[in-house]
């Protein structure tokens, strides 16, 4: 019996330790957006086109890297269910393998087009290099089960203050609403 209790306790503690706290609810009072115009408005990185193409489009124009930094744009590769890929803006780094991002249009159905602030993203890559991530899934109240290939981080020209960056999420969504479709 003591062995079972120890096993149960370690499983419970492990489950608690591996689950980040829930992020705030999606922003109310902001228009529905695609991820690209929102990421452009919040990060100041002036790239266009499908999200997955941002990595190559940044070459020679913006620094790129494998490490997260506030204001950097995380570029996720396209998949069969996410044909344009996805971009999100790093707000802050929580730990070696966890960041918080702001993004738009993550999800489907009623979640489509919403702007979400302070969303956990976890590095699950075997080499700890941010090449494979899992993203918080609001409707399920936990990390999504899908692993997404990440192309890397497109870095802004200057490093923004994380507090100001987080405060600019809603204003950036309103700015992006005027640039939809580009």
Where are these regions (language model features)?
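Secreted/periplasmic proteins that engage bacterial cell-wall peptidoglycan
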Residues: 25-89, 94
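Aromatic- and glycine-rich peptidoglycan recognition patches
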Residues: 96-182
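N-terminal export leaders
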Residues: 3-8
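Intrinsically disordered, low-complexity segments enriched in polar/charged small residues
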Residues: 9-10, 169
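Bacterial signal peptide processing site
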Residues: 17-19
């Amino acid at each position: 019996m003591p062995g079972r209790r120890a096993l149960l306790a370690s499983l419970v503690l492990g489950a608690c330790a591996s689950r980040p706290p829930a992020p705030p609810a999606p922003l109310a009072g902001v228009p529905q957006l695609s991820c690209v115009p929102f990421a452009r408005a919040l990060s100041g990185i002036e790239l266009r086109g499908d999200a997955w193409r941002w990595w190559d489009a940044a070459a020679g124009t913006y620094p790129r890297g494998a490490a997260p930094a506030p204001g950097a744009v995380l570029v996720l590769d396209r998949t069969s269910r996410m044909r344009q890929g996805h971009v999100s803006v790093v707000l802050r780094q929580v730990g070696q393998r966890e960041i918080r991002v702001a993004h738009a249009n993550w999800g489907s159905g009623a979640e489509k087009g919403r702007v979400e602030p302070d969303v956990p993203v976890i590095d699950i890559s075997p080499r700890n290099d941010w090449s494979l991530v899992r993203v918080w899934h609001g409707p399920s109240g936990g990390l999504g089960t899908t692993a997404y290939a990440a192309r890397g981080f497109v870095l802004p020209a200057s490093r923004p203050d994380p507090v100001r960056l987080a405060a600019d999420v809603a204003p950036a969504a309103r700015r992006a609403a005027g640039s939809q479709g580009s």
